């Protein structure tokens, strides 16, 4: 959430910043409400001053034994008007909050300006895509030929955009998650968490999924109780650990890693990636979350992104880092790097991790604060990124490590998790 004081003091700068996202926002409603608020605030303060003055007169009159009924009637009338003014101010606050809740974050000054993914800027590449001496198959064909990837049975059980992994492939999927967790905890200093897969609306509001993106979520109704939602990412439960908390400055940074399934309706996918495991309703992710001092968030963003890259390098998967342009960033992000892994069957790079710095945007929605060196509370900065998406990493291994005989070579770093197995072959 943006700071309402920023809108009040420099609305033009806010509008200019948000316009970089490619969708100019009409602030006429905000301006009209703000004008009414100022008038009402001034009138309320005048009425309060009048009431206080008249109340003193009443005391003086009564002290002299004189009639105070006329002045008391004036106080009563002022009280009625005050009550109406205060009620309207409360309504305006609700309207302001609704406007603020719908506004995305302002892109950082370092973010390239562009309207869509064509404006994204490549920062680096790592690894050289393999040259095959046989016809490359996509991950769906590779997995099905192994007899270990079954979309038909998954569709029977649940419908489209689900998969069923079997045998060695299921074990490889588990090995990937374990390897990622071990790396981030042992080498990168993260604390592992096991978090709820169902969260309340307040948690989704805090990280920015609600109210704008409810159609992307799976909602669980519970009779007359408040609904819960299946998490779209571990970012939601993990970041909300600091909701409504005041931390000590010494406690920062907080660095958490969490492996969860993620659930998304893919309402806005427009029929993309229907085949295979690229875009599913249920998929696993190992998520990195940091809560940091505001002065450290830019540095933390580079660190977190690099930690996700290290996983790809250990797996020997070619990738590139992209700086997302202003029009392609997520709602809550101030700056985002995407890591894209090479998929030979598609002959292109595809997103496997998105690493974002949210600045104070989420913290303001969550009221996640720390006490600074002047003993005053200040908003934290939050960051997160996939370290990595497990299913898409599995896809990349199936495609990049496939062999002419249909087998798949297991990356060396995963073999200890696979009982020393070097190759996945058809049963």
Curated annotation (Swiss-Prot):
Binding site residues for L-serine: 233-235, 287, 386
Q: What's the catalysed reaction?
A: tRNA(Ser) + L-serine + ATP = L-seryl-tRNA(Ser) + AMP + diphosphate + H(+); tRNA(Sec) + L-serine + ATP = L-seryl-tRNA(Sec) + AMP + diphosphate + H(+)
Establish whether keyword Aminoacyl-tRNA synthetase is in the entry.
yes
* EC number of this enzyme: 6.1.1.11
- What protein name applies here? Serine--tRNA ligase
Which terms under GO biological process does the entry name? selenocysteine biosynthetic process; seryl-tRNA aminoacylation
Per the record, the similarity remark reads: Belongs to the class-II aminoacyl-tRNA synthetase family. Type-1 seryl-tRNA synthetase subfamily.
Matching entries from InterPro entries are given as: aa-tRNA-synt_IIb, aa-tRNA-synth_II, aa-tRNA-synth_II/BPL/LPL, Ser-tRNA-ligase_type_1, Ser-tRNA-synth_1_N, SerRS_1_N_sf, SerRS_core, tRNA-bd_arm
> According to its UniProt entry, what is the function of this protein?
Catalyzes the attachment of serine to tRNA(Ser). Is also able to aminoacylate tRNA(Sec) with serine, to form the misacylated tRNA L-seryl-tRNA(Sec), which will be further converted into selenocysteinyl-tRNA(Sec).
Q: Where in the cell is it found?
A: Cytoplasm
Q: Name one GO cellular component term.
A: cytoplasm
Q: In which pathway does it act?
A: Aminoacyl-tRNA biosynthesis; selenocysteinyl-tRNA(Sec) biosynthesis; L-seryl-tRNA(Sec) from L-serine and tRNA(Sec): step 1/1
Q: Name one GO molecular function term.
A: ATP binding
Domain notes, please? Consists of two distinct domains, a catalytic core and a N-terminal extension that is involved in tRNA binding.
Q: How does it assemble?
A: Homodimer. The tRNA molecule binds across the dimer.
Task: Give the top-level enzyme category.
Answer: ligase
Q: Which residues does ATP bind?
A: 264-266, 351-354
> Keyword annotations for this protein?
Aminoacyl-tRNA synthetase, ATP-binding, Cytoplasm, Ligase, Nucleotide-binding, Protein biosynthesis
